């Protein structure tokens, strides 16, 4: 069961909307992201097996380990030692799209609790500098202990008032990579957050849509020449994804869209748009030199 407004939009947008809704009703497994600074997926699976927990590698992300049960993970040594963090496989793929390199300057523009920030930090082997921005001080506060547990020293969390904050403007033209994990309706997370479908109404779409467009505009200004901008949501709605990107590209003809699936494919991650749609959506853009 989904809200009528979402059903009406999905029917128009997806030819296979029935399969999509069925997938939404299934309970989600627990995905872990292995912190490769401290362990390998094989080592984590072996440790879990020794404790009688069945685990397997994820379908797409090289760092993903999937559990069929949802244990009190925070009490386990592998969690306390920073070997794993809880992160949906789709979110792990977004860090792979950013493809940060050692020593680069990176901004996670809407960092939230910092799950993707930590994934970026591990990919950068704790080198360079990552700015983790968010307007929610309470959510961002959880990042510092998680950083320490993960053994990362290259992350700099900062609370901002909005996307036009002076802290943001000071970094215009300085970033190698910027990730915009935009605030959204969360329609792609109903498997994990089933109550969300009744908390977010169609009337809020207009407001959140304006925020999405404003955030991506500001984030783009942070890039240096040859940088990379990644826009992602956990929404299945075209209005929050392709439409936002189309508007942005119309306003910014000096940017071009890359093929996200080719970027993942070159990293050995084979996933089709059909398989990816249950995670939400993502786009990679480059400013023209």
Regions found by a protein language model. Name each.
Residues 1-289:
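S-adenosylmethionine
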């Amino acid at each position: 069961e989904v809200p009528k407004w979402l059903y009406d939009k999905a029917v128009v947008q997806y030819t296979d909307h029935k399969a999509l809704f069925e997938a939404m009703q299934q309970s989600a497994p627990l995905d872990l992201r292995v912190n490769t600074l401290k362990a390998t997926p094989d080592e984590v699976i072996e440790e879990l097996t020794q404790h009688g927990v069945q685990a397997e590698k994820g379908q797409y992300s090289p760092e993903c380990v999937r559990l069929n049960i949802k244990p009190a993970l925070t009490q386990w040594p592998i969690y306390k030692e920073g070997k794993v963090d809880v992160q949906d496989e789709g979110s792990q793929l977004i860090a792979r799209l950013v493809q940060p390199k050692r020593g680069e300057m990176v901004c996670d523009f809407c960092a939230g609790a910092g799950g993707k920030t930590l994934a970026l930090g591990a990919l950068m082997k704790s080198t360079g500098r990552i700015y983790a921005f968010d307007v929610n001080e309470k959510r961002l506060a959880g990042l510092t202990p998680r950083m320490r547990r993960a053994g990362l020293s290259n992350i700099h969390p900062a609370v901002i008032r909005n996307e036009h904050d002076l802290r943001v403007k000071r970094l215009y033209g300085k970033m190698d990579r910027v990730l915009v994990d935009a605030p959204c309706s969360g329609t792609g997370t109903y498997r994990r957050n089933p109550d969300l479908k009744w908390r977010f109404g169609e009337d809020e779409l207009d407001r959140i849509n304006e925020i999405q467009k404003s955030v991506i505009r500001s984030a783009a200004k942070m890039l240096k020449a040859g940088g990379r901008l990644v826009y992602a949501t956990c929404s299945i709605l075209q209005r929050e994804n392709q439409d936002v990107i189309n508007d942005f590209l119309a306003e910014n003809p000096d940017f071009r869209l890359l093929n996200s699936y080719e970027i993942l494919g070159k990293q050995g991650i084979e996933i089709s748009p059909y398989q990816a749609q249950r995670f939400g959506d993502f786009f990679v853009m480059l400013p023209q030199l």
